[in-house]
Regions:
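Short, polar N-cap/turn motifs at the start of nucleic acid-interacting alpha helices
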Residues: 186-192, 272, 288-311
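Short, charged phosphate-coordinating catalytic segments
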Residues: 110-121, 169-193
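Catalytic-site neighborhood detector that most strongly recognizes the C-terminal catalytic loop/helix
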Residues: 139, 201-205, 300-325
């Protein structure tokens, strides 16, 4: 394979590129992993983001093999976009997964352009868009959370730990990377006597202070203020089983894409529970308890009320009740 430098879309001249797109994607991801490339908050990328980009490398490589072509910077045009999306659609990937891979490619292309490796601006076209679709991100009600908390899991240490770590997420409304690593260094007492968790969010660097409710304090006491080490993949596996044991089996309608068509089917709620459900549940239940939105945002780290309201799960009926209670 021989690489020919792409032509500038504005001048028509060749732009000098020291490495191919494939090589740059590999370097970009490696630098994310070793910490030499930071995110927009000037912080190291989280493990889940790095995992997504590694997945993108595999998918991009498979796409190149399927098309029998090594795509380079100058090849990323609207025809490429249409082919890329069609290829994923034919493989029954969800709209949001396809959108995530398009977004990752756009981020990589922008970074390479800033580094002077190409002058291809077609990714900024409105037609080169990141596809998104609303997904059925559920939340657990306070009664469902209590059902999980009340289960006797003393005969299974791993499940017991997974349950407790998940509940910490429900009580703090933090991301797994933050709520699963809480230790004595994050716990302090305010002058008022209120016990709080004081932490810096790993993804954004936001400083948040969360009041410790009695249920949370019981878990912290159980582990002497240092949660046992847990792995997201394991907690994701166990929490579905735990939710089923707690009787959280309501049927939920979910949509998916098959052969480019949107279809729906029913899934038991327990099978939709995952580590991030804890954060969404915590934020939603705080809102339903009447805590002011701005106060909850101080805890979750959301920057705008619009962003926050899109994040929490409020039904049309709950919205109507909120309006009735606040004339």
């Amino acid at each position: 394979y021989s690489f020919h430098p792409p032509r500038s879309l504005t001048t028509g001249r060749h732009v000098r590129s020291r490495e191919s797109l494939g090589d740059y994607i590999a370097r970009f991801t490696h630098e994310m992993e070793d910490g030499t490339r930071l995110n927009i908050h000037k912080l190291r990328y989280g493990a889940s983001t790095i995992k997504n980009y590694k997945g993108f490398i595999i998918q991009f490589d498979e796409f190149c093999k399927a098309k029998r072509k090594r795509f380079d910077f100058g090849d990323i045009d609207l025809k490429f976009y249409d082919d890329f999306v069609a290829w994923f659609t034919a493989k029954d990937y969800s709209i949001n997964t396809i959108g995530r891979h398009v977004k990752e490619l756009k981020i990589i292309m922008r970074a390479a352009r800033e580094e002077g490796l190409h002058d291809n601006g077609l990714i900024e076209s409105r037609k080169f868009r990141v596809l998104t679709a609303d997904v059925e991100n559920i939340y657990l009600t306070e009664s469902e959370i209590r059902a999980i908390a009340n289960l006797d899991l003393s005969d299974n240490k791993h499940k017991d730990i997974a349950r407790d770590v998940f509940l910490v997420g429900c009580y703090t409304a933090q991301r797994f990377s933050d709520y699963s690593t809480i230790n004595e260094g994050n716990i302090r007492t305010l002058e008022s006597g209120q016990l709080v968790i004081d932490l810096k969010q790993q993804k954004t660097g936001n400083h948040v202070i969360i009041p410790v409710r009695p249920e949370l304090q019981a878990i912290l006491d159980k582990y002497e203020n240092r949660l046992p080490k847990s792995y997201e993949q394991k907690v994701n596996k166990f929490i579905k089983e735990i939710a089923r044991e707690a009787g959280i089996t309501e049927k939920i309608e979910v949509s998916y894409v098959e052969n480019g068509e949107r279809k729906t089917h029913l899934v038991e709620k327990c099978d939709l529970v995952k580590t991030h459900t804890a954060r969404r549940s915590g934020a939603t239940n705080m809102y339903l308890a009447g805590i002011p939105t701005i106060a909850i945002m101080k805890i979750t780290g959301h920057k705008t009320e619009k962003e926050f309201m899109k994040y929490i799960k409020i039904t049309e009926e709950q919205t109507a009740m909120e309006l009735m209670n606040h004339p």
